[in-house]
């Protein structure tokens, strides 16, 4: 079977690159749910063509969807699952139209590795196994469109839990380290929200009566930043700040 799989991959190299290019060129972040729905439909069709009983799970138009399914549901073995996401951190046209390109043997473009490349690998893993006559166990897939925002919509988390339930192993198709080492675990993130309140006063004739919330927030931001410890792998990132009313009011 190994030889059959290797031959299939070699014979389909250009098809793999073409699908990779098309997916990367369908740009969009989770901030553009319309783009996520378009990509989800494209992915669902591709996996259906590969034999996967696949569908797009939608909750609302403004919420990025989930693509999930299974091939070989009646096979005797315990299922495995491939997971991932099809959103990126980049807004459309950040790198101009059709940003996918290959230079000196390397591919470039938004999401080319994180993680549209991993989704294309999943697609062709399934195709290669099918071509080789694999019948050992069911293979499930589950991909969301809002991972880069932390899967803020509980719907995606529910779908991942549903499809992963009962699986013997899961393969998250995110890119590994740049040195090609195998990545067996990932550091997750936690989002926090901090409100800082001041005392409103006129900044000209009543300055001492006020307390500037922005100044206090600046101290808090520096304190958070000082919690960084690269040796321990601790990353603190004050990312978004909103505050103030008008220039002459504390």
Segment roles from a protein language model:
Residues 2-110, 130-135:
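Acidic/His- and Gly-rich active-site-bordering loop/insert found
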Residues 21, 44, 120-127, 158-161, ...:
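Predominant activation on well-ordered alpha-helical scaffold segments within soluble catalytic domains
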Residues 75, 103, 125-140, 224-233:
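Phosphate-handling active-site elements
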Residues 90-92, 134, 183-188, 247-250:
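Short glycine/proline-enriched loop/turn "hinge" motifs that connect secondary-structure elements
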Residues 106-120, 202:
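Glycine/serine-rich anion-binding loops at beta->alpha junctions
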Residues 115-187:
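Acidic/histidine-rich catalytic neighborhood of metal-dependent amide-processing enzymes
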Residues 184, 204-250:
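Acidic-enriched catalytic cores of C-N bond-cleaving enzymes acting on peptides and small amides
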